[in-house]
Amino acid sequence: MTPLALIPGWGFDARVWQPVVERLAAEFAIHPLDHAPSATLPEGAIVCGWSLGAMTAMQLALDQPERVARLVLVGATPRFVQAPDWPDAAPPESLQAFAAGIAADPDATLRQFAGRINLGDDRAAPLTRRIAALLADRRADTATLAAGLARLRDLDLRKSVAAIRQPTLVVHGERDVLMPVAAACWLAEHLPNARLEIFLGASHAPFLSEPERFAALLRQFAHE
């Protein structure tokens, strides 16, 4: 079976992908990954990353091109933090506030962040309950969270994406308040072999908003 590597977003583990795994496990060999850009991939893998995980996925495609067959980038951006030439991103002070919160009360800060993931989503209430359940039975790892924030602060892949030659599916929620849809449009335009799918009525986690549609898209993309 084709390997499917799944990389979660900041603050989450592999369980966030469960609705997708339930729909695709019979067709793909599932490989949960963390955010380490040095992870060794199985050959011919489809690498699917969400948010920070999408940035890791792009790094893997650059560093291990012979192992990455295709990319799926969800809620993605080449640069998370605003810059003078990059306005469609998070203000630096928001990351600073999260860093301070992680140092003071990591569990409360993670819950606060999770509450923003589904802002504006048509299915916000059930999605927020699902995400809260994912966070309820695990303690926040302060060092891991801080390292993830540092990567979000420092990573800038804008000059590198032209070297990513793999077929790429960019999936973004129309109402994403954490990462403007303009960032996904930029990626779709600058990646050499990409197409963009916008989920209307969805926010930062479209694969949770519409898991059936997302799984069908990934399945179709894998066989193109």
Give the residues covered by each predicted segment.
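Conserved alpha/beta-hydrolase "acid-adjacent" motif
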Residues: 177-183
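Conserved alpha/beta-hydrolase catalytic His-Asp/Glu region
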Residues: 104-155, 159-160
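Short beta-strand/loop motif that positions the catalytic acidic residue
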Residues: 164, 170-172, 176
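Catalytic histidine-centered segment of alpha/beta-hydrolase-like enzymes
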Residues: 202-215
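Flexible "cap/lid" loop of the alpha/beta hydrolase fold
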Residues: 62-63, 67-104, 144
